[in-house]
Amino acid sequence: MSTNRLTLPALSLCLTSILAACGGGSSSSNSVPPQDTPVAGMATGSGANAVADPTLPRPPGTPCVVQLYQNLNFSGFSSQSFSYQPACSGPYSKIVLEADYTVTAGRQFDRTTHISLGGVNLLTGTTQEPSRSVAPTWHVERDLTEYASLFAKTQTGYVDLDTIVDGTYNGQPSGSARLLFYPVSASAAAGNSANYVYPFTSGANGRPANLNNSSSVLSQTISFPGNVVRAYLDVIAQSQSNDEFWYTCAPDNLATPLQTCGSTAFRETQVSIDSVPAGVAPVYPWIYTGGMDPGLWRNIPAVQALNLQPYRVDLSPFAGKLSDGQPHTVSISVLNANSYFSVLGTLFVYTDPYRSNVNGGIIANTLTAPAAPVVNNQLSFDSSGNASGTLGTTSGRQFQISGIVNSSRGQETITVTQSMSFSNVQTFTATSQNIVQNTSVRTATQIAKPGRQVTLERTSSYPLQLNFTVDSNGNWKTTSSQEIVVKNKLADDRGTLFAATMDNLVNSSSYAPAPAPSVRSATQTFSYTDSLGSCYLRKLGSQNLLLTSAIDAASCGGAGSIARMPWKVDPQGGTGFLGPIGFSFDFSGNG
């Protein structure tokens, strides 16, 4: 029956026959050795913006295309609607959202944009700021295969990009978006899609909820089907307003003397079910293209600035509980929010294809309310109010949640184990402020039944370094190093089934020695490798607002690395393509 049954070898993860089943290829031993290759469409010497992020690999076949909207201008603060009708018969091997944006040359701030359908968020991103002479354009993609059930009916969608367009802010944003449905074929099996997709937004127009403090929540009360076997909540917590630069914040008693925000420099997204702690997600320190110093991001934006990626919280231990026939309230909050975070969520629910009812429940849960972050204040202030010394903020937690579900696969024990550590150290002198921050998270989901177990392990690291200095002439220099590293590993008791590493690093510098011209530079390096033979490495560089280099590295075969990548994978680091972890495996050992 169902779109939610996946046997990894059969569904083109190609664990035993990578190249044949996934459309990859191998080079002949007589081939010319690969070389660094200039990136097509990225001209050195250009003032255009550029990103090294990969596009999504595609399955074979011609997609059926549904245009959501085209060349739509944005002005004002109202969502614009579009009509969606299912025009592409399924099943689908892959579904991709493509969106293209531009802002005319002129003056305009960075803005946030959302695309939603039936209240479900499909894309969240922010815009590239223009300049007087440069009209930026950019292209973003998201793998929406897991959303397939959402696209089965006619419904209304919305897009918003709140902005002011007038004589002062005259940069005009516009955009287009479309869905590409790739057909199933002999070489492209049906992709994994959830049976139910639930929105966590502020309403039918798919806008986020603004959470002002730790007590603010985004909640949905849902009557779930009686046969839930897996549940995953994708969360985006986007810092705004007073919280935009939350990593520069300080305890409330130091906020005024340091002229910064309060509530400490620690934030955390928390998930509960019926007021019981159910999961935790780190908050990524996104920096938008008008943030800190817009000159840092004029050519190369910060990590994920144009395409914010959600963090997945595995709620599968609660599958038995959610199947009990009672409504359940799932809530999202942000610890230490201080006006405010824009929060969105999407809940993916997979059901048993053979039973209309399953049962089970939670057997252990050590997740509790967090302790306050530890603050180490080594600051002193001179008579002029200048701070010197260090201010450290740390937090850490470990927890385990286990549940059982009795399904058509027998009794499974699902255990989520997570450890998280956070450190933020701010160093002050009379002429500088330096911030060194890192968040590290390790999450392992283990699905076990007698004689077999499957584990998905995900580790994420979010290093951030910022340095602000002022020279003797009062000129400011700002440097930034921002990175996200994600490692995914899927294994059973026979060994590793799939492993992948994604690393996205942006380094930027801006110095304004007035009246001399500003000196600005930036680099981005994006790499992705996996156990199926994927290899992607793109490097960009810019100097003084001009692109100086854009190469696909020889170590990954130069140009064409996306085309050689197995189409199933997500080089942006997502795991949705793996489907309902554990439930998709034949525990007899045959699949």
Task: Please name every model-derived segment.
Residues N212, V217-L218, S241-C249:
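A short secondary-structure junction signal
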Residues A87-V96, F224-Y232, D243:
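Extended extracellular/luminal ectodomain segments enriched in beta-structured repeat modules
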Residues P33-D53, P60-S79, S83, A87-C88, ...:
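Beta-strand-rich ligand-recognition modules
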Residues I18, T221-S223, R312-D314:
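Generic structural detector for well-ordered beta-strands
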